């Protein structure tokens, strides 16, 4: 293809993402666009076509960004090349959204006409504005009886400040007016710019590991071209490879002769060392390199840490390999080796939130056939010691001795909770119960309020979202960001089973609630840990002080069952022998602790009972 033809082709490219709050219909709109552009045949069509991870389809959510190329025959008679990047909506995966937007010139903002603007609608719109994208508002689910398209448009104008005069009312489910969205993409989203003759400059916005092809890079070419046989250099790692294949996803991989400035596609180069190909790096021509790399991504800081341990210690290296491969596909995941007296060798992993942690554990078990135990998640505490030093503690078991500690600071988040007026009282009560500090309250309209609280992250990570939904009948939506560290009166609580401290069950609590939490956890463990044939004392302790105790009763095996009646001496002998055996087992016996026990530290009593 000559330069003039390439420039003409570049003018017909449109790169865009679909962003929205969770459940507002992003993936359904992506399905309709693929269907209406004949990218997917009716026979191959299924719901959530871009959510190719089985886990995404089961949960009905998007976890990974996904890029697909399609051709649209517009009303002006020209064929346009669309690169659509579907993005997640859950707050835990906002990092995926920011990476997607960096590869685009425009974003379709989908808002559910029955729900209106919600917390992640705002958060994702601000991400799009930060990336200087053209935003097309689309009002979805207008076919539902409870839809209020005009009220939703007013919310978008009042709360986001976007003009909605040309917003399109659609039903992604039935396809109503989706053709108008396709035309708006052509008319309103600008074509990419980028010098076709400049040295190659391409941003890696995603990557995954393929057993046959090595690392497969998802790239947005900003300048120049790349083709099979080219020598490419990773500007960060300085590694050089020869390109084996370039292509597009449509949505299956299709090899192409080249990728040029403006294209979104994939590059393979027999990359076997995962560390060479980091998301956010720039690839350039090794023989004619560009002078400076593209701005990469802000490295995400994990918000939640948990221990991941193989149930079989021999699988430790398998777990390491699996985590390395997942990290390639999920740059927000961090991990480092750690050991536990109770669980052996494993990894301390950092996650963006509880859903992220859940998804990683499930992917490790499914995709890599691992059997894992996950410890209760915790946050990073800043521990100021009497000697003037400060230690960051991610694992409660590593908390220094209480005599060394001068003060402890914990991370707080700034939580924005959008809620109907009727539920403001319930939201404030929940936030107070979770040690929240009130900031402000903004009235968004006559019926909706945005309540802002500063809440300890440790109170948010587990059941806050579920409790928020249940106390507001599902009407509240939450967005949060790390705010700062604040001093708190915190103590470490150890759990002892049969007199032995189980390091993996240690947790941090505010001193005011420590005794109550200790009693709660002890009684929960009593329900969860199966009875064994000796009595197990369950104790909670702060330092050497026991603050709670309960006992798991022993099974009583009927050793006299086979004795005929009328032999009291024999019966007494057997019972005495059983008693002596139990004493011995108690001294050497190991308590079998199920996975549920490690999560019980964070669960509510109702969840244990169900």
From Swiss-Prot:
It comes from the Bacteria. Gene3D superfamilies: 3.30.70.240, Elongation factor 4, C-terminal domain, Elongation Factor G (Translational Gtpase), domain 3, P-loop containing nucleotide triphosphate hydrolases, Translation factors. GTP binds at residues 23-28, 140-143. Its EC number is 3.6.5.n1. It is an enzyme of class 3 (hydrolase). Keywords: Cell membrane, GTP-binding, Hydrolase, Membrane, Nucleotide-binding, Protein biosynthesis. SUPFAM superfamilies: EF-G C-terminal domain-like, P-loop containing nucleoside triphosphate hydrolases. One of its GO terms (cellular component) is plasma membrane. It is a peripheral membrane protein. SMART domains: EFG_C. Pfam families: EFG_C, GTP_EFTU, GTP_EFTU_D2, LepA_C. It is found in: Cell membrane. InterPro entries: EF-4 (IPR006297), EFG_III/V (IPR035647), EFG_V-like (IPR000640), EFTu-like_2 (IPR004161), LepA_C_sf (IPR038363), LepA_CTD (IPR013842), LepA_IV (IPR035654), P-loop_NTPase (IPR027417). Residues 11-193 form the tr-type G domain. It catalyses: GTP + H2O = GDP + phosphate + H(+). Required for accurate and efficient protein synthesis under certain stress conditions. May act as a fidelity factor of the translation reaction, by catalyzing a one-codon backward translocation of tRNAs on improperly translocated ribosomes. Back-translocation proceeds from a post-translocation (POST) complex to a pre-translocation (PRE) complex, thus giving elongation factor G a second chance to translocate the tRNAs correctly. Binds to ribosomes in a GTP-dependent manner. HAMAP family: LepA. Belongs to the TRAFAC class translation factor GTPase superfamily. Classic translation factor GTPase family. LepA subfamily. This is Elongation factor 4. It comes from Limosilactobacillus fermentum (strain NBRC 3956 / LMG 18251) (Lactobacillus fermentum). The lineage of its organism: Bacteria, Bacillati, Bacillota, Bacilli, Lactobacillales.
